[in-house]
Amino acid sequence: MKLVIVGCGRVGAALAEAFANQDNEVIVLDTSTRAFDRLSDEFKGQAIRGDGTDEDVLRKAGAEGADVFLALTEGDNRNVMAAQVAMEKLSVGKAVAKINDPVRAAAYAELGIATVCRTTMLADAILAFLSLGSSGMPAVIAPVPHVHAEA
């Protein structure tokens, strides 16, 4: 499977490592070369400095026709723009944008963009933990995934 990850923060780097370790073709883009310090020395994918919202940069990086495109920067708008470019111009199989503002999820879904909102996931995980009580619960709360996409 070919994956393109825009944003090599903690989430992007962790996913890049995990997918690369499963023998997938992984391309990671970030505007800062320092971000690639989060990747291990054994990282089997490509790390490319560039703007993940720029169609030409994405094409040169080999993103066209990727099976999965993950936009994981800290900016909702940047992630949605990158996912739109990937879907509309690069014919990727699936595109997901990480967002922080849950209010925007519905609007992005109307555009056909799948989103993962860490704000909603964290709130849901805490609510689930509190509603179940703490007896027998693990010290680490596992997130409940929420992916919003147009049906």
Where in the sequence are the language-model features?
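Cytosolic regulatory regions of ion transport systems
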Residues: 1-151
